[in-house]
């Protein structure tokens, strides 16, 4: 397996698909990396020579990927929580951040439903 940016990418797949196994590289970025490295998108990873592999590694090194990108995202969320913005408060409470309704759904963010005891009816 070829190792790029600390990730073992699959050798049987095309290079443009294999690069997407790296966190922070999607389809468009993978295409740009290959274009800048002068490597065809259709070639398989196992067919790459050392020069092509090092060119791809050089291009990927210019992009924020993997641990650095995860750390940056986490720090951005922490900053929002520290300054007390609306988005930060929603993150802190574990509720949807982007304005979705929470009356009926939002189970992914809120977790399992909590049992709520009903109000007792007064006897007649």
UniProtKB/Swiss-Prot annotation:
One annotated GO biological process: translation
Region annotation (Disordered) maps to: 91-124
**Any idea which GO molecular function terms this record carries?**
rRNA binding; structural constituent of ribosome; tRNA binding
What does the subunit comment say?
Part of the 30S ribosomal subunit. Forms a loose heterodimer with protein S19. Forms two bridges to the 50S subunit in the 70S ribosome.
The family database entries (HAMAP family) matched by this protein are listed as: Ribosomal_uS13
Q: What's this protein's family per the entry?
A: Belongs to the universal ribosomal protein uS13 family.
What protein name does the entry list?
Answer: Small ribosomal subunit protein uS13
Q: What is the lineage of its organism?
A: Bacteria, Bacillati, Mycoplasmatota, Mollicutes, Acholeplasmatales
